[in-house]
Curated annotation (Swiss-Prot):
GO terms for biological process: lipoprotein biosynthetic process. Pfam families: LGT (PF01790). The chain crosses the membrane at residues 17-37, 56-76, 88-108, 222-242, 255-275. Its main location: membrane. It is found in: Cell inner membrane. It is a multi-pass membrane protein. A 1,2-diacyl-sn-glycero-3-phospho-(1'-sn-glycerol) binds at R139. Its EC number is 2.5.1.145. NCBIfam families: lgt. It comes from Neisseria meningitidis serogroup B (strain ATCC BAA-335 / MC58). This is Phosphatidylglycerol--prolipoprotein diacylglyceryl transferase. GO terms for cellular component: plasma membrane. GO terms for molecular function: phosphatidylglycerol-prolipoprotein diacylglyceryl transferase activity.
Amino acid sequence: MITHPQFDPVLISIGPLAVRWYALSYILGFILFTFLGRRRIAQGLSVFTKESLDDFLTWGILGVILGGRLGYVLFYKFSDYLAHPLDIFKVWEGGMSFHGGFLGVVIAIRLFGRKHGIGFLKLMDTVAPLVPLGLASGRIGNFINGELWGRVTDINAFWAMGFPQARYEDAEAAAHNPLWAEWLQQYGMLPRHPSQLYQFALEGICLFTVIWLFSKKQRSTGQVASLFLGGYGIFRFIAEFARQPDDYLGLLTLGLSMGQWLSVPMIVLGIVGFVRFGMKKQH
């Protein structure tokens, strides 16, 4: 079993100011978005100009941050924040939701499109290929922080990793499993899936490769966005089987996690949209 490297979450500290790796992962994501967006403009595969791309980035950042935070509040810890509403603003304590951030960006796309006279689906198609590498960057940030670890796996598995931050969860899990209790006593940690890296590979690298290659040719309006929607939903659904469910929610109906249930409508809408828009092209 490998032990998580235990990176210092703070990259640079100057007096009271601290630059954290997780914040840097978001910044890197936005930089990659801009770089890829300009490349698509040069290739003639974008509805953006260089100026409008920079303008949209501001809208997108607001959508990601506000949507991600509100999504986490509503989807994951609503009762806690209802009792302590001021905690909503304590973003430095963590708590962001991809699905909330996605909805925030969709709203930003809608508003931006109306302002600039760009069709909603065309703008969605343009934005979709620019997103996955940012998601990959965010998952690396999660890994550096040693958060969002995976479920318990076999002690002899080559991918098994111990997370010191999970000791409370390890003790709770071992209390219900004699074998895990032996492992915990012997190694001080339970072997877990490094699910952040799985999500980095699936939702980041694989999704980017599929969408980037697919969108290099002219496609029916809405197909690229649908591929992103369904592709992310499928990859997230798969990765969630290795990811530790949120301790305050656990597994829900049919033994699925909140992340999986939130991904189901993405999968359905993505598949339906991909087929429907593809049929329009054929006619």
